Curated annotation (Swiss-Prot):
Gene3D superfamilies: Sodium:dicarboxylate symporter. Belongs to the dicarboxylate/amino acid:cation symporter (DAACS) (TC 2.A.23) family. One of its GO terms (biological process) is L-aspartate transmembrane transport. The chain crosses the membrane at residues 25-45, 58-78, 93-113, 159-179, 199-219, 236-256, 322-342, 370-390, 400-420. One of its GO terms (cellular component) is plasma membrane. The keyword Cell inner membrane applies. GO terms for molecular function: fumarate transmembrane transporter activity; malate:proton symporter activity; succinate transmembrane transporter activity. This is C4-dicarboxylate transport protein. It comes from Sphingopyxis alaskensis (strain DSM 13593 / LMG 18877 / RB2256) (Sphingomonas alaskensis).
Length: 446
């Protein structure tokens, strides 16, 4: 007599991938190739700028839809509980404010101790103010009122087409809340959006395959245009900034990670492909869609990731904050301006406001610094010309520090809100694949 017996078959282990097929290996190789090409054939390197620009545009093309789908479906799936939503936002902003302010203070303290600009004795009248005029113009446009009003889009659709992260987040929150209160039609739309979200994250995976090309072009352009030699002129400032950022990540953020139950080094290793992409393109936005996907795989609740990460890209820029106070004091020291304690406190307070809303794109930190110096009269804005030539080399460090800070913030807030699967986080950070469900096998027996 035949009988059907279900036997649980062990999942077939995946074949190990070749080492060269990993994205982080390809991006690292592309960065090295870009540096070599830009150094030995600078004319060719500068012509490759469209490769980097094109890749960043490809990624920015899908950022707004990814944020909208992640946040809207996340809020709708938890029933649009405004109390829970407000609690997440409140905790996230408390975290952002504390660590952003701490980063500003760290930059200020290091600048006073190391004094990278001391002894340069530069006459402000000899500086080329015209070289920074465009940054000053943009800085004067960046008022707090204009920033807050700009969060509200002209139309619902324009929030998804004009590339503004905060506008996309704003309409996603409203749409998610409306969806959660729409009853059965809302549940049907939610199901559809979840399917569309799967398609978009598949698109993210496709676009990431072009990351090595973008990193190669961006790095070849940077080295070809500015040259490695330009680093030597202001080497102390660059070294001070890099070491300060490293200290902030390893010691301060590392302590936060430790008390949250995981290692900052494991987190960095988990995000190595994204970090190399940020390094190559000098833009933390380039890896935003991939970061959202990886944090969800690491056990962070979808609504929390969708809220914390996009807002962090405007309000939690640790690298930019370190850079602002460090660079401002460097300029003051270089031109012989002795800032009193009161002046430095005023600088700190202004930077706390002007740093909010600095987008995670290349050059935004420089514009934000221009805005800060425009408000603080003690430091000449023309002094920006001193660091204009090397800002591009510090941009990578700003972006990397910002990126790590936002990844950590999402995990910490998820832990506070009990929206963190710690087993999934441990597996992800250890490099272990997610467990596969065993498949039943039907067999006939006589």
């Amino acid at each position: 007599m035949a009988a059907n017996v279900n036997v649980m078959a062990a999942p077939t282990p995946a074949r190990p991938r070749a080492w060269w097929s990993h994205l982080y290996v390809q991006v690292l190789a592309a960065i090295v190739a870009g540096v070599l090409l830009g150094h030995f054939w600078p004319a060719i390197g500068t012509e490759l700028k469209p490769l980097g620009d094109g890749f960043i545009k490809l990624v920015k093309m899908i950022i707004a839809p990814v944020i909208f789908l992640t946040v809207a479906t996340g809020i709708a799936s938890i029933g649009g509980e405004t109390k829970a939503l407000g609690r997440v936002v409140g905790k996230a902003f408390a975290y952002f404010l504390f660590f952003s302010t701490l980063a500003l203070i760290v930059g200020l303290v290091v600048a006073n101790v190391v004094q990278p600009g001391a002894g340069m004795n530069i006459d402000p009248a000899t500086l080329d103010a015209g070289a920074v005029a465009q940054y000053q113009a943009k800085a004067h446009e960046a008022t707090l009122t204009a920033f807050l009003l700009d969060i509200i889009p002209v139309t619902f659709v324009s929030a998804l087409t004009e590339g503004s992260i905060l506008q996309a987040l704003f309409v996603a929150i409203l749409f998610g809340l409306a969806l959660s209160h729409a009853g059965e039609p809302g549940r049907q739309v939610l199901g559809l959006l979840e399917k569309v979200s799967t398609v978009f994250f598949g698109l993210v995976g496709m676009l990431m395959k072009f990351a090595p090309i973008g990193a190669f072009g961006a790095m070849a352009f940077t080295i070809g245009k500015y040259g490695v030699e330009s680093l030597a002129n202001l080497g102390l400032l660059i070294a001070t900034f890099y070491l300060t950022s490293l200290f902030f990540v390893i010691v301060i953020l590392g302590a936060v990670a430790h008390f949250s139950g995981f290692s900052i080094f494991r987190l960095i290793a988990y995000l190595k492909a994204e970090l190399l992409l940020v390094l190559g393109t000098s833009s933390s936005e380039a890896a935003l869609p991939s970061l959202i996907e990886k944090l969800e795989k690491a056990g962070c609740a979808k609504p929390i990731v969708g809220l914390v990460v996009p807002t962090g890209y405007s309000f939690n820029l640790d690298g930019t904050n370190i850079y602002m106070t460090l660079a401002a004091l460097f300029i003051a020291q270089a031109v012989g301006v002795d800032l009193s304690l009161g002046d430095q406190i005023a600088l700190l307070l202004v930077a706390m406001v002007s740093s909010k809303g600095a987008a995670g794109v290349t050059g935004a930190g420089f514009i934000t610094l221009a805005a800060t110096l425009s408000i603080v009269p003690s430091v000449p804005v023309a002094g920006l010309a001193l660091i204009l030539g090397i800002d591009r080399f510090m941009s990578e460090c700003r972006a990397l520090t910002n990126f790590i800070g936002n990844a950590l913030a999402a995990i910490v807030v998820a832990g506070w809100e009990k929206g963190l699967d710690r087993e999934a986080l441990a597996r992800a950070l250890a490099g272990e694949p997610a467990p596969l469900a065993a498949a039943p096998i039907e067999t006939d027996t006589d």
